[in-house]
Structure formats: C-alpha cells, structure tokens
C-alpha cells in the first residue's frame, strides 16, 4: 500500500577483498575461529552491557530533548525520506501516471529513530547533524541498486549527466540508459534539459541539497 515498505537496508561490503583473501578468511573461520555459541555469547553480553550502561546513565528512562534537536539535522531527515520515497516508487509499465509512491511519514519516523539511536550511543538526548550520516547511507542502500547507481553518478557529476556519459560510466546499452533516465523523470527525481540532440538530465531543485559539500562527504564515506 501507500504506507510503504517496513524494511530499510544497510549493505556491509568489502569490495577490495580479493578472492584469495576471502578464501583464507573463511578457512580461518572454520579452523581457528570461536564456535557459534561462543560468538553468540560474546555478542549477547556486549548488547546487555550496552543497555546496562544506558540504564545506569538514565535510571528513570530516557527523556528525549526535542527542543535541543538540531533543525538542520531534522531537515535532512525529512529530505532523505522524500528522496527515498522517489527512489522506491513503483512505475506502472503500462501507464506511468499510475506510479505508486509510498507515504513518507513512516520513512521520516524511521530515519528519526535511527538518528536518535546514534545520538544515544554518544550519550546525547538530542540529535545533531553528524547523526544523519547513517541515514544517508541507509537511504541509498534501501533504493533499487540501479537507481542508487544512477543517483550516485549524478552527484559525482554535479547533478547533471548526458546519455553518452552514463553509457560510458555504467557500461549499459544506450536504450537501457535512456530507459533509466525516463524512469528518473517519472519518479520526479530529474528533468530533461536541452543539449542539442543529446539526452541530458539534471537533478531537480528539491534534491539539490544532496550536492552540499558536507552531505557529499558523508555519502562518499560509504560509497
């Protein structure tokens, strides 16, 4: 329905690890590593210790100080939710006007809760801009992979790219690239701009906040 997905994703990847390194790591895991029960116990004890620490610090429970929340952080949370809403839109192949977008309320609340969890880990009961870094990563990782790839490329190209450029970068065929461009227009992420006979897209103004230097730096740390 329009309420949207209940799941958000965070990809944990180590793309720089060679096949040989992966093999060696897995061999060590089954020959030298702790067994599953011991690992489970270590993780369980770490989680219990964390919550005991929080409980000791806030014996009467955590009272969230919303008045101290950074307004800029809240703005980024809302904008990230609206961005993911567009990235996850479901396009009707027979009628693009029937594209379904999720209601961003749930996304906004989920992102806010993630930021609050990060703040609490640093013993704060209010959020600051640094807390939104994980939300930006989750925003991208929760999008379909090819849409994430096109958006990241747009950001690296300062918000504009033409079809030939993206064919070269993505290694996709020209028709597929044009289809992806059209999808982004349907999803209200980009607009087509005049560039002689070349198809060229530009990030819509409502998403230009992603081109902010601090935002880009946060995104680049995880991509």
Regions found by a protein language model. Give the residues of each.
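A short, conserved structural fragment
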Residues: 185-195
